[in-house]
Amino acid sequence: MADLGTNVRYIKGIGEARAAALEKLGITTLGDLIAYFPRGYEDRTQVRPIRELTAGESVCVRGMVAADLTAYRISGGRTIAKTRVVDDSGSLDLVFFNMEHRRDALHQGDVCVFFGKVEDNLRRKQMINPLFEPEGRQQVTGRIMPIYPLTAGVTQGLMVRAARQGLDACRELLPDVLPDEVRQAHKLCYVNYAYENIHFPASPEALEVARRRLVFEELFLLTCGLQLLRQRRRDVAGPACRRMSMEPFYRRLPFALTGAQRRAIADAVGDMVSGKPMNRLCQGDVGSGKTMVAAACIWFAVENGWQTALMAPTEILARQHYQGLAPLLARFSIRCALLTGSIRAKERREILAGLADGSIDLCIVTHALLTEDVQYRRLGLVVTDEQHRFGVNQRAALSQKAEDPHMLVLSATPIPRTLALVIYGDLDVSVIDELPPGRQKVDTFALGESYRPRVQAFIRKLAAAGQQIFIVCPLVGEADQIPDERKAVTAYAKQLQEQVFPDLRVAVLHGKMKPREKEKVMAAFAAGESDILVSTTVVEVGVDVPNATCMVVENADRFGLSQLHQLRGRVGRGKAKSYCILLSDSQNEETRARLKVMTQTNDGFRISQEDLRLRGPGDFFGQRQHGLPAMKIADLSCDMRLLDEAQTAARQLMAQDPELTEPTHRPLRRRIRQLFDTNADMLN
């Protein structure tokens, strides 16, 4: 007897050849097959009178064949066959290419249902290669048909047949993992009905009922799984830290911290003295002072006898952290080291030795931290910067450097709390919702191409005053013809240097450069050796040049609000007035609304809410960390209400049964373990 783990080759009607084709889509088991959901649907239920047909629409027509197919050859050895179908309202031409093998399929007087796209041809309406079936024996017309994502060698016909065979094979096998009380409370259909109608909807209403059930289940399982991960974290001991006052740290800082920074530090320190490993996200706007929260946690860990590590996504940012933190922490006799992929072998050996013998308190690193030869004597705290560059699995790899270290994650992308659990998984969240005093407001302007000469004159004026300018240009091209990043940016910079700003120094920065090249360009720009830095969005994250007072974004319509806000955050870091100029000629209403928001506020949290409202959570969800189960059917751009429902239901259930050990909840726990297979050991 089959089960959901049965290889699809053993399903009746599929066999070896079709199974090999399905494997290209990641479908190897019966469970994979029924969970391979359609990407859309084609409604073939509406039969229209011929007189009412409009060119461009895909519809069903019921009519009588007016004449046998007439076939003849055309150029290239192809054949064409024609006939006409009539109903009470008019007639429609039917054209078939290369249908010799079916020339007897239609005869005069046959009554059939035809489905296809209507076209105009010399004032007559026609369908080319329509699907057709005898009336009363319909399988692919007169119903809502699924449209599946495909790959080479897999047709819609194959997928439809395979899905039908898969559903027939597992009709009695589908466990309903949702507890009855949850299903009934949220008015959800049974699982068999859901799978049948997500693949082969009986009606648009049945499709909606099925989708609602499956989306809810997916989000409910995800939430329960993450709750179990958090529960597991509470069951292990973290690096021991004693309670102590933070005042000695605060008193020796050269500036006062904001209330929001102190609250975030209190959250983190509370975690560290709890006896459990901290796993906290600290999110705050650009320039809100997240690094000082990290510095406080580093000081607290070192005071408690632990080593610490700070992991940055790029060498530029790692070096910047080192240059900012090392002098600050030296006030507290904390010994810092910078470990990146480009340091020399001798220096690397010395740092590794210092980590192993405990003489280095803080190591600031890029991905080098994850290599096997980096061993710490007593690692107690890991800080990762820019969460979306690292995922659950990478954090797990970091954890292996020590026995469940405290972990603090910094993110400059404010995420609405509704999404935080889904995107950041098992992290607790602290929010820094105020800026340090003196942080410059950046004046922002959204301008069309006609303003370019004035923008260029403004850039010259700033440069003459000794200030510096970022110019960011996105890669412009069709999806399958994206230009070479290096060539595109270099060519644009050359044009600016030779034709627009021959009297200024123009530098180039792009993602194809080697780390040392990027570092050299950024160091030169920070030292004032260039006036203008032309860049791709490599400057989006963390780059700090206080003398840069203007950010010009070309083709600003190609960026999301949150990304534009991150770019704007590269200026306004010094004492001089700063500006952000968004160039775009787009007439799209949504784009204009997005750019208008940028001119109205510098508040990253308001911007993230507007981004969510205008574009849905796709941008946020693109930052979702690796190691969490893939979303197969939920779409958070339209399923936010269901996310709220599912999260509430999951929390209520797990408040009653935190480990899901009650007999009625065990199928749910087993399903969660399957979904979180990469983290299954954490769910034990």
Which residue ranges define each predicted feature?
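Long, highly charged, low-complexity intrinsically disordered interaction regions
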Residues: 1-11, 20, 221-222, 232
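C-terminal accessory region of SF2 helicases/translocases
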Residues: 587-684
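N-terminal pre-P-loop "Q-motif" helix
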Residues: 255-278, 292
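Inter-lobe coupling/hinge segments of SF2-like helicase ATPases
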Residues: 234-237, 277-596, 656-659, 684
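Upstream accessory/linker segments immediately N-terminal to the RecA-like ATPase cores of bacterial MutS
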Residues: 71-252
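Short, surface-exposed secondary-structure boundary micro-motifs
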Residues: 64, 117-118, 225, 556, ...
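OB-fold nucleic-acid-binding modules
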Residues: 36-66
